[in-house]
């Protein structure tokens, strides 16, 4: 049986340090644990999930470009690029793949420079402040949205 939907999960800078980097803000769950849980969830939903974590903006942009034509939805935690990257915004606009922006912490309850996102206004939705669970909610929301449109 072939997968019903193809979803790309992107994680930005420093998320490779999850579990040990400021756990009081980001939790003790590692990125590998988050991705593993999402893969199990996706398999049960007949969804192909691919993943990239990169500290390099260009690698995330290249992955977004490569997704055109073979990806139905993007889940992205742009991390610090949220507040700085017009290039990520332009890449997402360029491929016209719907996406959900994810943040582990509540960015609106943090430093003022974290309150602005270059992506939120073009995202289908934003999930923030729910820790690792936010990824599960985002995957479910993406599949629900795709199922309704097919």
Swiss-Prot record:
It catalyses: 3-dehydroquinate = 3-dehydroshikimate + H2O. It holds the Pfam family DHquinase_II. It comes from the Bacteria. Pathway: Metabolic intermediate biosynthesis; chorismate biosynthesis; chorismate from D-erythrose 4-phosphate and phosphoenolpyruvate: step 3/7. It is an enzyme of class 4 (lyase). Keywords: Amino-acid biosynthesis, Aromatic amino acid biosynthesis, Lyase. One of its GO terms (molecular function) is 3-dehydroquinate dehydratase activity. One of its GO terms (biological process) is aromatic amino acid family biosynthetic process. Substrate binds at residues 77, 83, 90, 104-105, 114. InterPro entries: DHquinase_II (IPR001874), DHquinase_II_CS (IPR018509), DHquinase_II_sf (IPR036441). The record marks 21 as: Transition state stabilizer. Its EC number is 4.2.1.10. Belongs to the type-II 3-dehydroquinase family. Catalyzes a trans-dehydration via an enolate intermediate. Homododecamer. NCBIfam families: aroQ, PRK05395.1-1, PRK05395.1-2, PRK05395.1-3, PRK05395.1-4. HAMAP family: AroQ. This is 3-dehydroquinate dehydratase. It comes from Yersinia pestis. The lineage of its organism: Bacteria, Pseudomonadati, Pseudomonadota, Gammaproteobacteria, Enterobacterales. The gene is aroQ.
């Amino acid at each position: 049986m072939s997968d019903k939907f193809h979803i790309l999960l992107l994680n930005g800078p420093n998320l490779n340090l999850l579990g040990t980097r400021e756990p009081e803000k980001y939790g003790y769950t590692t990125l590998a644990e988050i991705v593993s849980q999402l893969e199990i969830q996706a398999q049960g939903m007949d969804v192909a999930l691919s993943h990239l974590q990169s500290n390099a903006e260009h690698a995330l942009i290249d992955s977004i470009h490569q997704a055109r034509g073979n990806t139905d939805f993007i889940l992205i935690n742009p991390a610090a690029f949220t507040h700085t990257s017009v290039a990520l915004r332009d890449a997402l606009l360029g491929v016209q793949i719907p996406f959900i922006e994810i943040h582990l912490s509540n960015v609106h309850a943090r430093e003022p420079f974290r309150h602005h996102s270059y992506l939120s206004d073009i995202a289908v939705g934003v999930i923030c402040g729910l820790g690792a669970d936010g990824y599960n909610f985002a995957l479910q929301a993406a599949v629900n949205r795709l199922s309704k449109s097919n």
